[in-house]
Amino acid sequence: MNKQRGTFSEVSLAQDPKRQQRKPKDNKSSISGTKQEIFQVELNLQNPSLNHQGIDQIYDCQGLLPPPEKLTAEVLGIICIVLMATVLKTVVLIPFLEQNNSFPNTRTQKVRHCGHCPEEWITYSNSCYYIGKEKRTWAESLLACTSKNSSLLSIDNEEEMKFLTAISPSTWTGVFRDSSHHPWVTINGLTFKHEIKDSDHAEYNCAMLHLDRLKSVQCGSSKRYYCKHKL
């Protein structure tokens, strides 16, 4: 449009020379301004890439960013992993830890109730228990417990038996007999009335706790032992 104005001005001046002579300064200024406008328009038309370059850079920068759908999917994936880990911990790990800690918890409760056992002794109910660090014969175990002001293990009830078996599956007890023709007695001289397996063997005259039952074995064999001291 500016180009048309400039052309129209030039034609008008050519047709009216008298008018051109009356105002020479104004026409010269108008022509100069028109030429500048035409040059600016032509420059813009010749270099359209300059205007689009900035726009392309903006779109290129935006293309570097992940779309909102991708970000949402990644966040949901992380949340799912965290939830699965929490469920596995609740279902598997916590019951496992509770099961493994059931006996230590029982001992802790008993210690709080009594709390008078020497160091390295286990407290359960109203008694203290010492676990021998080495295997000994029945007679040697009896002497070792006597030196600790205690007696070789005696079992009062089934609950105590289960508790001790969970700590050590095999140990001497303070039950014996003189021969297969004599009854089983405790070290205190009391008749032992509970069943003892394999009591028909003539040489098996000492009783031990094995798993959840009592069985007769040779008194000269080496076994682990418990010392017991009642509070």
From Swiss-Prot:
<keyword id="KW-0391">Immunity</keyword>
<feature type="transmembrane region" description="Helical; Signal-anchor for type II membrane protein">
    <location>
        <begin position="71"/>
        <end position="93"/>
    </location>
</feature>
<keyword id="KW-1064">Adaptive immunity</keyword>
<feature type="glycosylation site" description="N-linked (GlcNAc...) asparagine">
    <location>
        <position position="149"/>
    </location>
</feature>
<keyword id="KW-0399">Innate immunity</keyword>
<dbReference type="GO" id="GO:0062081">
    <property type="term" value="F:activating MHC class Ib receptor activity"/>
</dbReference>
<keyword id="KW-0325">Glycoprotein</keyword>
<keyword id="KW-0675">Receptor</keyword>
<keyword id="KW-0735">Signal-anchor</keyword>
<dbReference type="GO" id="GO:0005886">
    <property type="term" value="C:plasma membrane"/>
</dbReference>
<dbReference type="InterPro" id="IPR033992">
    <property type="entry name" value="NKR-like_CTLD"/>
</dbReference>
<feature type="disulfide bond">
    <location>
        <begin position="145"/>
        <end position="227"/>
    </location>
</feature>
<keyword id="KW-0812">Transmembrane</keyword>
<dbReference type="InterPro" id="IPR016187">
    <property type="entry name" value="CTDL_fold"/>
</dbReference>
<dbReference type="Pfam" id="PF00059">
    <property type="entry name" value="Lectin_C"/>
</dbReference>
<keyword id="KW-1003">Cell membrane</keyword>
<dbReference type="GO" id="GO:0043323">
    <property type="term" value="P:positive regulation of natural killer cell degranulation"/>
</dbReference>
<feature type="disulfide bond">
    <location>
        <begin position="206"/>
        <end position="219"/>
    </location>
</feature>
<dbReference type="GO" id="GO:0002223">
    <property type="term" value="P:stimulatory C-type lectin receptor signaling pathway"/>
</dbReference>
<feature type="glycosylation site" description="N-linked (GlcNAc...) asparagine">
    <location>
        <position position="100"/>
    </location>
</feature>
<dbReference type="InterPro" id="IPR050919">
    <property type="entry name" value="NKG2/CD94_NK_receptors"/>
</dbReference>
<dbReference type="InterPro" id="IPR016186">
    <property type="entry name" value="C-type_lectin-like/link_sf"/>
</dbReference>
<dbReference type="GO" id="GO:0045954">
    <property type="term" value="P:positive regulation of natural killer cell mediated cytotoxicity"/>
</dbReference>
<protein>
    <recommendedName>
        <fullName>NKG2-C type II integral membrane protein</fullName>
    </recommendedName>
</protein>
<keyword id="KW-0430">Lectin</keyword>
<feature type="topological domain" description="Extracellular">
    <location>
        <begin position="94"/>
        <end position="231"/>
    </location>
</feature>
<dbReference type="GO" id="GO:0030246">
    <property type="term" value="F:carbohydrate binding"/>
</dbReference>
<comment type="subunit">
    <text>Heterodimer with KLRD1; disulfide-linked. KLRD1-KLRC2 receptor complex interacts with TYROBP/DAP12 homodimer; this interaction is necessary for the expression on the cell surface.</text>
</comment>
<dbReference type="GO" id="GO:0004888">
    <property type="term" value="F:transmembrane signaling receptor activity"/>
</dbReference>
<keyword id="KW-1133">Transmembrane helix</keyword>
<feature type="topological domain" description="Cytoplasmic">
    <location>
        <begin position="1"/>
        <end position="70"/>
    </location>
</feature>
<feature type="compositionally biased region" description="Basic and acidic residues">
    <location>
        <begin position="16"/>
        <end position="28"/>
    </location>
</feature>
<feature type="domain" description="C-type lectin">
    <location>
        <begin position="116"/>
        <end position="229"/>
    </location>
</feature>
<keyword id="KW-1015">Disulfide bond</keyword>
<dbReference type="GO" id="GO:0009897">
    <property type="term" value="C:external side of plasma membrane"/>
</dbReference>
<keyword id="KW-0472">Membrane</keyword>
<feature type="disulfide bond">
    <location>
        <begin position="117"/>
        <end position="128"/>
    </location>
</feature>
<dbReference type="GO" id="GO:0045087">
    <property type="term" value="P:innate immune response"/>
</dbReference>
<feature type="region of interest" description="Disordered">
    <location>
        <begin position="1"/>
        <end position="31"/>
    </location>
</feature>
<comment type="function">
    <text>Immune activating receptor involved in self-nonself discrimination. In complex with KLRD1 on cytotoxic lymphocyte subsets, recognizes non-classical major histocompatibility MHC-E loaded with signal sequence-derived peptides from non-classical MHC-G molecules, likely playing a role in the generation and effector functions of adaptive natural killer (NK) cells and in maternal-fetal tolerance during pregnancy. Regulates the effector functions of terminally differentiated cytotoxic lymphocyte subsets, and in particular may play a role in adaptive NK cell response to viral infection.</text>
</comment>
<dbReference type="GO" id="GO:0002250">
    <property type="term" value="P:adaptive immune response"/>
</dbReference>
<dbReference type="InterPro" id="IPR001304">
    <property type="entry name" value="C-type_lectin-like"/>
</dbReference>
